[in-house]
């Protein structure tokens, strides 16, 4: 019987099987940020186990509230900073070098096909775009990962999603994943790996694949995952060129992780994306989705462009194409948070930041801030935000606030009109 990519990764990293259905895996990368990691650090210190299993395999960043907004967040940042210095963790990104973790770490080439990756953050599934098994974990698992370099997981069952056809004009990876979540439901992939396949995925950039995998958790998925291919090789080549004689040789190695033709899936869902319209959410769950045609005209107070879902250069380019030479509506405020310093710098050099500022956007430093209602764009009670983030839970971006999830293109069109708008008219 053949194996899925997730099963192959599990088999290659298996350390122990303490009881049926549970696998203890060796970890390739443990990622840390200043919100969840300090809790693990404090407990390790209290237990007299302030150690790390391998400093080269730990990556840490201050990203959620940066710069710190108050004493509490400053203390959290200091705990992570002091810990990283104490253990000589070289891949630690402090103020000035920091960015949103799930954009920054791939940008640094830290994730490779076949890797096992954990973090105390639910959107760690983003890194599955590289053909890795990447999952968010709780504090106890994070502690064990930091200390021992292992983590326990349930035996993986995989749901395969075949995205067939071709993305229409004005429709992007964000629309595709919202459509998938709408079909699966918020619990439809609980404790499952979602394997994204098909012509649509094959044609996507790594940035778009990261958008897909980023929101696997919104359907309950432990991880999202894509097959590593020539697109993956091209993205990683600056970091792996010394390890392989050629890109072709790297691709041969990467293909060893591909799911076998006779792999067994718990479920296979075929979706033709060719006729898909831009998609937006309408309620307080990510599976509550409608087309922009159904939602057009809904007024908003704020537009937010950024996050680990859609704060990459590709996303900024899409939005800037629509915004160029235009102004945002006087009834809205618009905020752009580039996901990393490199994204910010590249956008500056391409003239994209000028386009956003001339349109009326406020441009912030790289941060998660507004996405989870912590800083740099928090909503007031009763306000509505058109957002490129990944969660629309009640109060997610501010107590009593309403969030509608959408693509960067739809958010840009919405900013221009001050109400939900179809981006296709501007393309």
From Swiss-Prot:
Enzyme class: lyase
Cofactor binding description: Binds 1 [4Fe-4S] cluster per subunit.
Top-level taxon in the UniProt lineage: Bacteria
GO terms classed as biological process: L-leucine biosynthetic process
Reaction catalysis annotation: (2R,3S)-3-isopropylmalate = (2S)-2-isopropylmalate
Enzyme Commission designation: 4.2.1.33
Family matches, as SUPFAM superfamilies: Aconitase iron-sulfur domain
PROSITE patterns cross-referenced by the UniProt entry: ACONITASE_1, ACONITASE_2
Cofactor(s) of this protein: [4Fe-4S] cluster
Molecular-function GO term, any one: metal ion binding
Binding annotation for [4Fe-4S] cluster: 308, 368, 371
Known pathway: Amino-acid biosynthesis; L-leucine biosynthesis; L-leucine from 3-methyl-2-oxobutanoate: step 2/4
Keywords, ordered alphabetically: 4Fe-4S, Amino-acid biosynthesis, Branched-chain amino acid biosynthesis, Iron, Iron-sulfur, Leucine biosynthesis, Lyase, Metal-binding
InterPro entries in UniProt: Acnase/IPM_dHydase_lsu_aba_1/3, Acoase/IPM_deHydtase_lsu_aba, Aconitase_4Fe-4S_BS, Aconitase_4Fe-4S_dom, HAcnase/IPMdehydase_lsu_prok, Homoacnase/IPMdehydase_lsu, IPM_dehydratase_rel_enz, IPMI_cat
Disulfide bridge positions per record: none
Primary role: Catalyzes the isomerization between 2-isopropylmalate and 3-isopropylmalate, via the formation of 2-isopropylmaleate.
Subunit structure as annotated in this protein's UniProt entry: Heterodimer of LeuC and LeuD.
PANTHER family, per database record: 3-ISOPROPYLMALATE DEHYDRATASE LARGE SUBUNIT 2 (PTHR43822:SF16), HOMOACONITASE, MITOCHONDRIAL-RELATED (PTHR43822)
Family classification: Belongs to the aconitase/IPM isomerase family. LeuC type 2 subfamily.
Listed name of the protein: 3-isopropylmalate dehydratase large subunit
Species this protein is from: Geotalea uraniireducens (strain Rf4)
